[in-house]
């Protein structure tokens, strides 16, 4: 990821929730949409609400510290994704899950999951609800739509291929 994108990617691309009860109520009202979570704390919070994500992407860490979480009844798929990068193999795994509508999956990332919101937006359906953590602020909830896809594609085009 180019350093020039750090500030851009640290902005929330959706509604920032700081209150768990309001987040829960919002999600209950959107129960017909596919829900995709990116991050360990976000995923654990959603599961605490007895809401099961269609896809959860986690790395076993919170703020770079290891956490021991039990995410329950999911099929676990291990992928590798180094910090600051998005591996093509990981993009393909996310695409396969989202395009083929394969729910109840957890991508367990060896590395870092933060940037994987990007392929989730690109390959997700219009209307998917994507939830990710905003460090030291709360939880961002965004509804996948044409504007978001275009904006994320613009950002993704600025990434550089480092190896093949």
Swiss-Prot record:
One of its GO terms (biological process) is coenzyme A biosynthetic process. Transmembrane segments: none annotated. InterPro entries: GTP-dep_dephospho-CoA_kin. Pfam families: DUF359. GTP binds at residues 40-42, 59, 61, 113. Belongs to the GTP-dependent DPCK family. The keyword Transit peptide does not apply. It comes from Sulfolobus acidocaldarius (strain ATCC 33909 / DSM 639 / JCM 8929 / NBRC 15157 / NCIMB 11770). This is GTP-dependent dephospho-CoA kinase. Catalyzes the GTP-dependent phosphorylation of the 3'-hydroxyl group of dephosphocoenzyme A to form coenzyme A (CoA). Pathway: Cofactor biosynthesis; coenzyme A biosynthesis. GO terms for molecular function: GTP binding; kinase activity. Keywords: Coenzyme A biosynthesis, GTP-binding, Kinase, Nucleotide-binding, Transferase. It comes from the Archaea. It catalyses: 3'-dephospho-CoA + GTP = GDP + CoA + H(+). It is an enzyme of class 2 (transferase). Its EC number is 2.7.1.237.
